[in-house]
């Protein structure tokens, strides 16, 4: 049984299939780059999911990208915006913490590029399934920034300090197959099989004991 799509958001969408909540980044025209408005919607959507009877969260992106990173200056934004670091601290990082602290398992279906903070969103999940065409990128070094969104905490713990430094300092694309070899993702599947695989895993977790989410 599938619930109706939640239409109260502009930049994210929530759907429910049985006890699996599907949270989709829904701004394909900007490759699902996370604007402050989208992050606010994400926070509200996560609250909705926490209040629901969902037993597992599946997160993915609409269109050809999972998430192109943080869009700190969305189109039409006025001058005089606060510094990027301040925006990250007040908008982005609290949502990352909120996701991380959810008491249900999380699966990510990485349908395309996962860049910058979008990479952190992808790999913070308990189970990460990537499309074969997907890639991961920490591009901060190219613009003189340190990795954000929890990457400096997550990456060394998942793939080890040496490879985390390589990703951060060289800012090279990491193809899905290499990410699998490195232990960054759990499974790589053909693009047209991604949601089937991810939903199958999410349903399995949703039907498991609640202790899986703790």
Question: What positions do the PLM features span?
Answer:
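Glycine- (often His-adjacent) and acidic-residue-rich active-site loop
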Residues: 51, 61-98, 114, 142-144
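Conserved CoA-thioester-binding segment of acyl-CoA-metabolizing enzymes
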Residues: 2-62, 97
